[in-house]
Design a protein with these regions (language model features):
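Short internal loop-to-helix segment that lines adenine-nucleotide cofactor pockets
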Residues: 43-66, 128-130, 145-204, 215-220, ...
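Short, glycine/acidic-enriched loop or turn micro-motifs at the edges of active sites
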Residues: 70-72, 96, 122-124, 186-188, ...
Length: 280
């Protein structure tokens, strides 16, 4: 544990703070802006030119997508721009500090996208939780079942968790029929949420973006899930395809995958995107 974290756990650190921001136009995309969050360790700004090209392989105007763990909108806005005003993105983000920036990004791009923000944590039941964070701007954290002295999260935020599929059916039933893409990054809850959404995923081909753990156990769990639903997967980094994910490979750090069904109506387009990238 770092000295700074120890002092924060002792109550000697600064309180939770909402940092200032700057709204800047995105070069090359007319009418699109990005809200830069001016925290000590800001998240990287997405390359929206690459993002729009990437997501256009399987999304189009009128489609809907779901982003679970939307953070400040860095994984939200790209697909939302492709879905356009006639479609949209349902973005789950329970953390009020990051949701503030997410809502700004949704608002400044309202003329060219449609982002519906859900201020709840996704799960498989309805309950209240406490999320813990290690930094006073609360950028990266979540619910932990161990002592704060183990995980180092000195800053707490109380959030409401919902049964994800039940909530979506009640609040977004028409949009749910048009969902083509789901991204999940919810700390330790990813697999719980995936199982909760399995009926939706199995009802029609849905492109998935998932985080896979670096360990052999984590990778094999991901592979078992993909085999159980008959999906093909490729490792991705932002809007770039890296390589096919089909077996355990020793590595350092978790990674993202893009997974899709051979029955997906855009299968050929997605495969072309993936194979072209891995051959370059």
């Amino acid at each position: 544990m770092r000295a700074r974290e120890f002092l924060q756990l002792m109550g000697l650190g600064p309180g939770i703070r909402f940092y200032p921001f700057e709204i800047r136009p995105v070069s090359g995309l007319h009418g699109v802006s990005w809200v830069h969050w001016l925290v000590p360790k800001p998240p990287p700004s997405p390359n929206f030119i690459l993002e729009v090209d990437f997501f256009s392989a399987f999304l189009k105007a009128g489609d809907w997508a779901i982003d679970i763990g939307a953070h400040v909108g860095d994984t939200t806005l790209g697909p939302a721009l492709v879905c356009g005003k006639t479609g949209g993105m349902i973005a789950f983000e329970p953390n009020p500090t990051t949701m503030h920036v997410l809502s700004l990004n949704a608002s400044v791009n309202r003329s060219c996208s449609n982002v519906a923000i859900v201020p709840f944590a996704a799960g498989d039941d309805d309950r209240y939780l406490t999320f813990e964070y290690g930094d006073h701007w609360c950028s990266n954290g979540g619910h932990h079942d161990v002592s704060k002295w183990v995980h180092g999260g000195a800053y707490t935020i109380h959030v409401k968790q919902v049964d994800t599929l039940k909530f979506l059916k009640e609040a977004y039933s028409p949009e749910l029929q048009k969902v083509r893409y789901i991204k999940i990054d919810a700390e330790a809850m990813d697999w719980v949420i995936l199982e909760n959404l399995r009926p939706l995923i199995e009802s029609k081909p849905t492109v998935l973006r998932l985080e896979i753990g670096e360990t052999q156990e984590g990778q094999e769990r991901g592979l078992r899930y993909l085999r159980s639903i008959g999906y093909t997967a490729y490792e991705v980094n932002d809007a770039r395809v890296i390589d096919k994910f089909e077996r355990y490979v020793p590595r350092r750090g978790s990674f993202d995958i893009l997974a899709f069904s051979p029955e997906d109506p855009c299968y050929d387009s997605i495969m072309n995107l993936c194979t072209r990238a891995t051959e370059d």
